[in-house]
Amino acid sequence: MMNHTTSEYYDYEYDHEHYSDLPDVPVDCPAGTCFTSDVYLIVLLVLYAAVFLVGVPGNTLVAWVTWKESRHRLGASWFLHLTMADLLCCVSLPFLAVPIAQKGHWPYGAAGCWLLSSITILSMYASVLLLTGLSGDLFLLAFRPSWKGADHRTFGVRVVQASSWMLGLLLTVPSAVYRRLLQEHYPPRLVCGIDYGGSVSAEVAITTVRFLFGFLGPLVFMAGCHGILQRQMARRHWPLGTAVVVGFFICWTPYHVLRVIIAAAPPHSLLLARVLEAEPLFNGLALAHSALNPIMFLYFGRKQLCKSLQAACHWALRDPQDEESAVTKVSISTSHEMVSEMPV
């Protein structure tokens, strides 16, 4: 018989063997800080609903604006691809919310188990790889001015964007291989989870690859790029580019740290039980990232928000270098007008 913790009722992606013979976790709450299972379920469902309701229309608007912009501004194409990755995740949320509402029962069969969970992992990998490419592009634009108008920039950006999706798909395969539809008896239900079949090496390998390629490696690269840009070229820095990078890591860092703890924690330990209890909320925070970018577009485009949402998105995508150049031209033009109006 399996002794389950609370979290498995709400998490559609957990490591099945970790839930075997876990220690009993106290259910009394002397400080009044514990959630009941019903409150926990409601919090998760509200979170999923909010992400869906904000993310789908928001990302659709951003996708439309960035698609129009990308036809004559290469930089906007990065946000078009990022938005598509976020939309991919957002549209899957109603399907992922159903097992939460049914307290862990998976109604979509083995194919749905494999497909829906793989979509979220693909979205994560594609997003972080695209953000890595965006950071490199911004770095080259700042320190190699000739890069902006170079023909090989267009080719390079397109190659990196396509490679981000292909590599993301490739990195999704290992976890998909171990995904199973599992039968439980107490209570009777089907659960979508990862079953490594007791293979510690497989679990460690997949966790390590996900941590290095989906988190640590991109984090080091992007922190280096944006740190140098912020210190040495603050006036030409693109705040939206930095904001989407920071937002990604705020949302996904707890998830990756949690996966490492789950892989490293001793089996049947109290630490593992506690971590698994918190897992659904950490997963929800990671998925919430898919609704974050539209909010950032509205924030950075707030000066034009009174005109229209489209105008706000256009303003958020503006290039600080172009804006600086425009200000310079206006200043020069104004100076000429003042000189011409001076009495001789």
From Swiss-Prot:
It is a multi-pass membrane protein. Pfam families: 7tm_1. It comes from the Eukaryota. Highly expressed in liver and spleen. Lower levels in intestine, brain and kidney. Also expressed in adipose tissues with highest levels in gonadal and ingual fat depots. Lower levels in brown tissue. The keyword Iron does not apply. It is found in: Cell membrane. PROSITE patterns: G_PROTEIN_RECEP_F1_2. Glycans are attached at residue 3. The keyword Disulfide bond applies. Residues 68-78, 144-155, 232-243, 301-344 are cytoplasmic. Residues 1-44, 102-120, 179-208, 267-280 are extracellular. GO terms for molecular function: complement receptor activity; G protein-coupled receptor activity. GO terms for cellular component: apical part of cell; basal plasma membrane. Keywords: Cell membrane, Disulfide bond, G-protein coupled receptor, Glycoprotein, Membrane, Phosphoprotein, Receptor, Transducer, Transmembrane, Transmembrane helix. The modification Phosphoserine is found at residue 325. The chain crosses the membrane at residues 45-67, 79-101, 121-143, 156-178, 209-231, 244-266, 281-300. GO terms for biological process: chemotaxis; negative regulation of interleukin-6 production; negative regulation of neutrophil chemotaxis; negative regulation of tumor necrosis factor production; regulation of interleukin-8 production. InterPro entries: Anphylx_rcpt_C3a/C5a1-2, Formyl_rcpt-rel, GPCR_Rhodpsn, GPCR_Rhodpsn_7TM. Interacts with C3 (the anaphylatoxin peptide C3a and the adipogenic hormone ASP); the interaction occurs with higher affinity for ASP, enhancing the phosphorylation and activation of GPR77, recruitment of ARRB2 to the cell surface and endocytosis of GRP77. PANTHER family: C5A ANAPHYLATOXIN CHEMOTACTIC RECEPTOR 2, CHEMOTACTIC RECEPTOR. Belongs to the G-protein coupled receptor 1 family. Receptor for the chemotactic and inflammatory C3a, C4a and C5a anaphylatoxin peptides and also for their dearginated forms ASP/C3adesArg, C4adesArg and C5adesArg respectively. Couples weakly to G(i)-mediated signaling pathways. This is C5a anaphylatoxin chemotactic receptor 2.
